[in-house]
């Protein structure tokens, strides 16, 4: 049954307006973005098919155009709608953490990093550069691929920090597997970076590992001091 044929007030858009966006399921939120489904299949039903096919939102939003088009009813238009929604979310986070903003709210940092890295299908190691007052200078993605102690080069991190005249940094990387629990390699990388940055009198404030739905902070676990 198409959404337009549902009883009045039961569609996802009506539910959003009546009860708030937080009350919608993943499939209902996705249906609002899709706007319509197929003949005889509602947008919510199509959304459920997509979520089942990809195994969740993260993999779905990381899918390429060709991968999405494997699903009947999905083409370039719906792909563009989904990509626009992702990019808007990232730009909102970017505005919240723009250059010159004092980084005093850990939740703001977490939100920004989650939006930037959680949907990546590959590992990204990045650095948030701060001045002496912990104002944001720049967010830079340094390395991509398999992130381990052999693929993250402290000298490149130090070079960037010196170039940008940063006084403190927060490093971060994502786990495409979805889990945020740091590995032994993550801890080794952190120790190497902490030592390298100390030689130029720059503070490593934190190393954050981004998973599907959570972020683990080295500082909060006492692994930075």
UniProtKB/Swiss-Prot annotation:
CDD domains named among the record's database cross-references: MPN_DUF2466 (cd08071)
Positions of Zn(2+) binding: 173, 175, 186
Gene Ontology MF annotations: metal ion binding; metallopeptidase activity
Top-level taxon of origin: Bacteria
Record-level GO BP terms: proteolysis
Protein keywords: Hydrolase, Metal-binding, Metalloprotease, Protease, Zinc
Residue span, MPN domain: 102-224
Pfam families: RadC, UPF0758_N
Motif JAMM motif in this chain: 173-186
InterPro entries: MPN, RadC_JAB, RuvA_2-like, UPF0758, UPF0758_CS, UPF0758_N
Signal peptide interval: none
NCBIfam families, per the entry: PRK00024.1, radc
Family indicated by similarity: Belongs to the UPF0758 family.
The protein's name: UPF0758 protein Shew_3481
Species, as recorded: Shewanella loihica (strain ATCC BAA-1088 / PV-4)
